[in-house]
Regions:
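Peripheral interaction segments used for macromolecular assembly
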Residues: 1-76
Length: 76
């Protein structure tokens, strides 16, 4: 699967049922030495004049299933 195919998928936490946003709005954390994806930050991570919005960091290994329209994650 190409990374671009993940952009429109919703991220759902299977433990809580929480919708964590769209993968295309996430920032990836990549290991500079190996090039592996370590984690991604879901939700709004933009900077506003008054406050910085913080997303939730999700480890790449916590992805349990990538379906046709969503990504299922599980808490560690």
């Amino acid at each position: 699967m190409k990374l671009s195919e993940l952009y429109s998928k919703e991220i759902i936490n299977i433990d809580t049922g929480e919708n964590l946003g769209i993968f295309g709005d996430c920032d990836l954390i990549i290991d500079e030495k190996t090039g592996e994806i370590i984690s991604f930050i879901s939700g709004n991570t933009h900077f506003s004049f008054f406050k910085e919005s913080k997303g939730k960091e999700i480890l790449w290994k916590n992805i349990k299933k990538i379906g046709s329209d969503m990504i299922i994650i599980e808490n560690d």
